[in-house]
Amino acid sequence: MGTAADSGAPIGSRTLSAEGRRGEVRFFLQRVAGGLYVEREEIPRRGLRTQQSVQFTDAEHFRRWCDNDPIRFEHPLLHVSLRRDADALWGDLDAADGSSGA
């Protein structure tokens, strides 16, 4: 099992992935005007690829969604990285909102 983060992603976005026995899971996070855009892609060694795209308007809904994802148990390091990177992006979004209001 491995976990990777893409440091070459554009500012305001993150790409994370983990590979295990059953295949690979990838997440793409990006700040957007309305909150946080998330893509979740599951790439099994056999079978169909699954992709979800979701936009969250607040951090609490994202955290609930993230904590209900099975990766929490299958790839705990990816889960921790996903929460940490999302928190950083939410913080960047809050800072941008605060500076535009001044």
Protein language model features and the residues they cover:
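Mixed-charge, Lys/Arg-enriched low-complexity segments
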Residues: M1-G8, R45-A102
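Amphipathic, interaction-prone secondary-structure segments
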Residues: G12-E42
